[in-house]
UniProtKB/Swiss-Prot annotation:
Keywords annotated in UniProt: Ribonucleoprotein, Ribosomal protein, RNA-binding, rRNA-binding
The gene coding this protein: rplU
Molecular function as annotated in GO: rRNA binding; structural constituent of ribosome
Job description of the protein: This protein binds to 23S rRNA in the presence of protein L20.
Name of protein: Large ribosomal subunit protein bL21
Family per record: Belongs to the bacterial ribosomal protein bL21 family.
Length: 115
């Protein structure tokens, strides 16, 4: 079973037990976080695709770590002018471990003509 979730402006394919680095979340280490914006769930040969998200589906994860990525350097310069600007950036992240992919009651609506 796997799911595609959306968090922090990005989409991730997750399975149960998977470790994942996502954009910084407000929860502390050891707390549980629930991702409700599930775009797709595949369970065996069943495929549930949301429009835009699957109703009653949720992915639960446990926060394992809060940290910062490796530094990237941004360098801007103007040729032949002896002018250079250096800048660095470290992005914050939250490492989570997916504990459960829950697919709620997926009810199919049947339209009937009132004739």
């Amino acid at each position: 079973m796997y799911a595609i979730i959306k968090t922090g402006g990005k989409q991730y394919r997750v399975t149960e037990g998977q470790m994942l680095k996502v954009e910084k979340l407000a929860q502390d280490v050891g707390q549980s976080v629930k991702f409700d914006d599930v775009l797709m769930v595949a369970a065996g040969d069943e495929l549930h695709i949301g429009t835009p998200s699957v109703k009653d589906a949720a992915v639960t994860a446990e926060v394992v770590d809060q940290g910062r990525q490796a530094k990237i350097e941004i360098i801007k310069f103007k040729r032949r002018k002896h002018h250079m600007k250096r800048q660095g950036h470290r992005q914050d992240f939250t490492a989570v471990k997916v504990t459960e992919i829950a697919l709620g009651k997926a009810k199919k609506e049947v339209k009937t003509d009132g004739a």
